[in-house]
Amino acid sequence: MAEIATELVSVERALWSGAATSVTAQTTEGEIGILPGHEPILGQLVENGVVIIRTTDGEKKVAAVQGGFLSVGKHKVSILADHATWSSEVDVSSAEQSYKGSDTDSHDRAQAQSELRAVQRAKEK
């Protein structure tokens, strides 16, 4: 099976690096799917997006992402996020409270929204 080297890095930490069969990300131009052999591109990630990485061993890795860039080269995908959290790390009740709270600022609300989306996307097949 064809693969592409992929890395997901945020300002705080490197989240993952390895071989993937596909990468899906939400950019300011819309959702994009990257497969091995994709044309090189540079995209800006949305403030409340989700990144899905399908690894070569069949694992689906889902992260909530706030801003940053996606760079696709001939043999590599680099996702450089301002902030990223694995769906498995999300405290759902806290994220729901932040999303629904009237005293939550727009940045925190966007982060909570992307975390809840990531949890939902992780449940999908």
Swiss-Prot record:
Subcellular localization, as worded in the UniProt entry: Cell membrane
CDD domains reported for this sequence: F1-ATPase_delta (cd12152)
The keyword Ion transport is annotated on this UniProt entry: yes
Chain residue ranges for the region called Disordered: 94-125
Keyword Transport part of the UniProt annotation: yes
Bilayer topology: Peripheral membrane protein
SUPFAM superfamilies according to UniProt: Epsilon subunit of F1F0-ATP synthase N-terminal domain
One Gene Ontology term, aspect cellular component: proton-transporting ATP synthase complex
MF (Gene Ontology): ATP binding; proton-transporting ATP synthase activity, rotational mechanism
Pfam families found in the cross-reference section: ATP-synt_DE_N
Keywords: ATP synthesis, Cell membrane, CF(1), Hydrogen ion transport, Ion transport, Membrane, Transport
HAMAP family per the UniProt record, alphabetical: ATP_synth_epsil_bac
Family statement drawn from the similarity comment of this UniProt entry: Belongs to the ATPase epsilon chain family.
Function in brief: Produces ATP from ADP in the presence of a proton gradient across the membrane.
Subunit structure: F-type ATPases have 2 components, CF(1) - the catalytic core - and CF(0) - the membrane proton channel. CF(1) has five subunits: alpha(3), beta(3), gamma(1), delta(1), epsilon(1). CF(0) has three main subunits: a, b and c.
Protein name: ATP synthase epsilon chain
Lineage of the species this protein comes from: Bacteria, Bacillati, Actinomycetota, Actinomycetes, Mycobacteriales
Gene field: atpC
